[in-house]
């Protein structure tokens, strides 16, 4: 998800997005551990998406 889309969401929406990304990241980690993941770059992508969402969430919470 792009930063502009995240910034348009409210705090609850961003928190829901973080939870969904964390579940996806966990699933990808399990696939990697069992040698089922062919494209390991998705781990990096989801990890950075989680960090991006957490940063925007912190900015929104600090602003209010």
From Swiss-Prot:
Molecular function as annotated in GO: structural constituent of ribosome
Cellular component, GO annotation: ribonucleoprotein complex; ribosome
RNA-binding listed as a keyword: no
Stored Pfam families: Ribosomal_L29
Keywords, ordered alphabetically: Ribonucleoprotein, Ribosomal protein
GO annotation terms (biological process): translation
UniProt cross-references to NCBIfam families, sorted A to Z: L29 (TIGR00012)
Xref: HAMAP family: Ribosomal_uL29
Family: Belongs to the universal ribosomal protein uL29 family.
Protein name: Large ribosomal subunit protein uL29
Taxon lineage: Bacteria, Pseudomonadati, Pseudomonadota, Betaproteobacteria, Burkholderiales
């Amino acid at each position: 998800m792009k930063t502009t889309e995240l910034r348009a969401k409210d705090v609850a929406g961003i928190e829901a997005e973080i939870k969904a990304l964390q579940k996806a990241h966990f699933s990808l980690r399990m696939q990697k551990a069992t040698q089922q993941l062919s494209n390991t770059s998705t781990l990096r992508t989801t990890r950075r998406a989680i960090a991006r969402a957490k940063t925007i969430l912190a900015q929104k919470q600090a602003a209010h």
